[in-house]
């Protein structure tokens, strides 16, 4: 009998451990604003189902031609493994991580309308703030306030996260850009010359120009957000990151900037992810 009880206890312990593990859910949101369905992945921390607690939310944006899976897939960001390591070590709090999909409409494969900004016929930024965030706050136990939200991203998503935090500083407490696509020197009036519409939308939504032209009131709002950025020393975007950092310093908006050994690849971004998780809700 003692052996049976011991065996049953072992089974129940394993079941409880499995139920308590972190997981990634894939959701489909029917957007009235976009007139389309959009996918997103959501990481839920260990114990979410049983704790009854509310959690802070990190919105984590993928890069150009990436997907909602980029940050959590093996060989990509490997978020579940890294998040569990950081949380277990006490370096980051338990959090929900939302990874939206910004691939546009054309069979959801990218290209046309890809990106995080409103363009004609595809108001993605409007969808993000008027539909996605409210949907997440309604479906999950979130801390639905500025102190409970952060945003981060890589490359195109890094630029998107910075612009979102600039325009919606009341929504996010922190912003982290890794290898951010923060500006372009292309001609703003001729997107066809480069054949890629999303680069044109980036050029028209420059975070560097935003800071340069910001009013004193807008600069004060920027100071209500904690800013951090990094880039590889051999990354082709390091110069534009330096320009943004210089402009933020000129405007006296505090920002941390790290240039590390690396290029524009997943090795660099995986190494950045622990710092993203630590920084997002640092006390």
What are these regions (language model features)?
Residues 6-16:
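Bacterial N-terminal signal peptides
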Residues 21-283:
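Non-catalytic cap/lid and distal C-terminal segments of serine-dependent acyl enzymes
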Residues 1-4:
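Positively charged n-region of N-terminal signal peptides that target proteins for export
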